[in-house]
Regions:
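Charged, terminal alpha-helix-loop-beta segments
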Residues: 1-210
Length: 210
């Protein structure tokens, strides 16, 4: 992506920072997003950071007021091969520990949510934000209806930050209601998804345990 700065009707291309000048550790991205969550994702309400539950520790927990659902946000400062596996694991965590996340919401916001009626668990999603994703992850995000969203973050000179969502199948095709069988995620790994072992005839919006 080319980014320009305008001055007196003239454009100057800004240089993209890389390596240590961009995001040399994940906390830089995490702090940037958490401190500006309502600007970056207006529908998301920040709940907590690095929430430890069931042996896992998601980076950021948020509640989507438009979808009435929870979202986990993960940050990577380098390419990471386990994005899909980690995303599915966190998705399943939210499904298995619904009461714990509703209790967390009550603790942070002082509001009571009914586990079954006030939260749309089908809209649960895991968001990954990173400067880089592998070509396989990008392809998977376009072709498989996973509850995972990928965003590429870039830093340019003069303090310019860009955040680009990688287009998914969900973005280009309306969701349809189906009654297809559930699958067990422990039968599939990220490699299985990328090599085609996983059949996308199944409804990934209702995945069960990894």
């Amino acid at each position: 992506m080319k980014v320009f700065q305008e001055s007196d009707s003239k454009l100057t291309e800004l240089n993209q920072e890389s390596g240590n000048k961009a995001f040399d550790y994940e906390k830089m991205i995490q702090s940037l997003v958490e401190n500006n969550l309502n600007v970056i994702f207006p529908s998301l309400e920040f709940l907590t950071t690095e929430y430890q539950i069931d042996g896992l520790r998601p980076d950021s927990i948020a509640f989507d007021n438009d979808r009435n659902s929870f979202a986990i946000i993960e940050y990577k400062n380098v390419k990471h091969k386990g994005v899909v596996d980690q995303g599915m694991s966190y998705y399943q965590l939210l499904q298995e520990k619904r009461e714990a996340f509703v209790l967390l919401y009550h603790k942070k916001k002082g509001k009571l949510l009914d586990v079954e009626n006030d939260v749309n668990w089908d809209e649960t999603r895991v968001i990954f934000i990173s400067p880089h994703f592998t070509s396989h992850q990008k392809r998977a995000s376009r072709s498989v209806n996973l509850p995972i969203e990928l965003y590429e973050v870039s830093r340019f000179e003069n303090g310019i930050i860009t955040l680009d969502k990688l287009e998914s199948k969900q973005d280009t095709k309306e969701k349809t209601s189906t009654h297809t069988p559930l699958i067990r995620l422990d039968e599939y790994s990220e490699e299985d998804y990328l090599t085609g072992k996983y059949s996308n005839n199944y409804n990934c919006n209702h995945m069960v345990k990894r």
